[in-house]
């Protein structure tokens, strides 16, 4: 699949992979800042941003999209940074093609599954709520983004989250709005998006040890709990886990300078 991407700077290659509902647009500020030290590539994943839509959405497909992207742009062995769904994408990639990875930076996501048939998963419930809120927005009646924001405010109270989601709105030539995000497929394949890696595949010496690994979590986020660290280290036994204070799941928007600092320190030891 041909992925739209943005590129900044020069230096060792770094690929930033965005999360669910996101796009390269959310990472421009961080991409430009990291471009002072890296050659930064930020692709839009399938069914997101300006990349192509597909009838299917899974980590195996996104992993293969990333491999195709790297081969197309002659990126041999980059550092991979992924947030949320993008973090899962790069974990699936790194465990499948470890020889193509120079370092792994996973932002606020664990390798576990976040799906629960019992309905106990806060994250699964949150995603279903967000998808329904987007689907219930009557775009035929929306004249501008402020109206869309007001309509969504009755369902989604956080202004920050609404603005993040509304970055997916695009105006057609006839003046009507549409979602850049392929909401129908995201809803259909949400269970697959919430799935995790199988830790049993990495027993008996199959763990990933050939490159440094950093997990960065937000102090106010519930995506990486202390109880998840043993699971992380079953797959990545030498992984470091660090926490950014005063940040939730979207820590790249809440604490961008701290995130940049941790990335630079991890790669260059500064």
What are these regions (language model features)?
Residues 238-270:
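Catalytic active-site module of serine/aspartate enzymes centered on a nucleophile-bearing elbow/loop
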Residues 44-49, 110, 247-248:
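Short beta-to-alpha linker loops that shape the active-site pocket of alpha/beta-hydrolase fold enzymes
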Residues 95, 102-145:
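Flexible "cap/lid" loop of the alpha/beta hydrolase fold
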Residues 173-235, 240-243:
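Conserved serine/cysteine hydrolase catalytic core
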Residues 4-53:
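Conserved HGGG/HGGXW glycine-rich cap/lid loop of the alpha/beta-hydrolase fold
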Residues 13, 39, 74-79, 100-103, ...:
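Structural signature of beta-strand start/N-cap positions in the alpha/beta core
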Residues 139-193:
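Conserved alpha/beta-hydrolase catalytic His-Asp/Glu region
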């Amino acid at each position: 699949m041909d992925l739209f991407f943005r590129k900044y700077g020069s230096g060792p290659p770094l690929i930033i992979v965005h999360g669910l509902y996101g796009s390269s647009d959310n990472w421009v500020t961080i991409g430009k800042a990291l471009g002072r030290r890296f050659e930064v590539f930020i692709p839009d994943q399938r069914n997101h941003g300006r990349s192509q839509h597909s009838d299917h959405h899974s980590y195996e497909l996104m992993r293969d999209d990333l491999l195709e992207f790297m081969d197309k742009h002659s990126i041999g062995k980059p550092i991979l940074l992924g947030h949320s769904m993008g973090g899962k994408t790069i974990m699936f990639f790194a465990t499948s093609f470890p020889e193509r990875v120079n370092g792994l930076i996973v932002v606020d996501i664990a390798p576990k599954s976040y799906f629960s048939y019992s309905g106990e998963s806060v994250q699964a419930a949150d995603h279903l709520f967000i998808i329904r809120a987007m689907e219930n927005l009557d775009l035929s009646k929306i004249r501008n983004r402020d109206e869309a924001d007001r309509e969504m405010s009755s369902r989604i109270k956080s202004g920050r989250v609404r603005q993040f989601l509304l970055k997916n709105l695009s105006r057609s030539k006839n003046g009507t709005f549409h979602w850049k995000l392929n909401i129908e497929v995201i809803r259909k394949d949400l269970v697959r998006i919430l799935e995790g890696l199988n830790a049993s595949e990495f027993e008996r010496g199959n763990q990933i040890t050939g490159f440094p690994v950093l997990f960065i979590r937000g102090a106010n986020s519930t995506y990486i709990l202390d109880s998840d660290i043993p699971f992380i280290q079953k797959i990545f036994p030498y992984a470091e886990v660090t926490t950014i204070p005063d940040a939730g799941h979207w820590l790249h928007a809440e604490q961008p300078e701290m995130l940049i600092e941790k990335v630079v320190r991890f790669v260059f030891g500064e």
